Amino acid sequence: TQKYTELLKKYSYNRIIILSHTNVAADEIRDEILKLPEMEGVTKKAMKYKICTIHAYCKSRLVGRKEVFSYEDHKNLSMIDSLFNLQRVTESEFNADKHKFYRYLADAYGRGKTLKEHWKTCDKNAYKPYSLNSIEQMAYPYFEYKKDSHVCDYADMIQDFIDKAVEPDIDALIVDEAQDSNVPQREALDKMATKAFEYYFVGDADQTIFEFAGSDADYYHRLSRKAEQLEQGHRCGKTINNLCKRIIRPIWDYYGYERTWKPTDVIGNHYHLPSLDKRCSAMTTLLDKIKHTDETFLFTYRGTPSDSWVKKFFKQQGI
């Protein structure tokens, strides 16, 4: 909010745009901005497309197809072409980008590659049961369906903005979590900033974790060499801070730089659990915290997404 407050001294809020990658992040930023004394009397509705996702902003600037390709559209396509049924998905799975055909198209587009080009370098197992041949066969009816039904996908929102939209008349553009932006998104952002006096990327090159979808770690590390660094952390205590530094050290060494990460005043503790199947002192501590504190716990995983292993653990422990 500090940078936004500085911008408000020079520009109207109507001419300042903040974009992020998720609705949750955009909503959180909007809520914080609206708490500023300078924003008294400004409504959420007035800020709908002043602080939003990149896709929402691109879509708002377009005339024409507005409806997003939905699960109902997918079911319609599945009746037209049986290849779409090679992988059956529920509506929630479809909305979570679990269908591998649509995932492949999004990843190829995000990396700025054709379907054939992406196949040469991608993890082919990640898109099973589809092959390049089946994906190419499905692409034509998919594109025709979107055209005939006047619907668009998220890639269309970005590309249509790049190809057709007029550069917005704004004074400042701020991009949150900029390191997650893929190839076409960066092109769209540059177009948005054409008339802007100030253009900011906010993010952390060390957190570029979406390279599979087109984000470019090398690009953001080059960009961040002369960036303003935020040194004081507000989340992690000293123990976790030191652990994170050890984990990220190879990245710093690879790019040849050092960063200052100051922890909070909390010391904190680090526990190692070899597995959730065997008792150990760390397991005893974990169970005690789960059962007797109001702390929040996040269980993460590697590989195929599944919550079955942690549900089994909870049942075994009577949680």
Task: Report the location of each language-model feature.
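Accessory N-terminal region flanking or inserted into the helicase ATPase core
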Residues: 15, 90-174, 183-188, 201, ...
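Short, aromatic/basic amphipathic alpha-helical patches
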Residues: 29-43, 216-223, 309-318
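Conserved helicase motor core of SF1/SF2 NTP-dependent helicases
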Residues: 23, 168, 172, 179-266, ...
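Conserved helicase core region in the C-terminal RecA-like lobe
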Residues: 51-58, 174-177, 202
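Conserved beta-strand elements of the Class I
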Residues: 17, 298-300
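Short acidic-hydrophobic, aromatic-tinged amphipathic segments that line or gate anion-handling sites
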Residues: 268-282
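P-loop NTPase Walker
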Residues: 1-67
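Short, polar/flexible loop-turn hinges at active-site or ligand-entry regions and domain interfaces
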Residues: 13-15, 38-47, 64-78, 87-94, ...
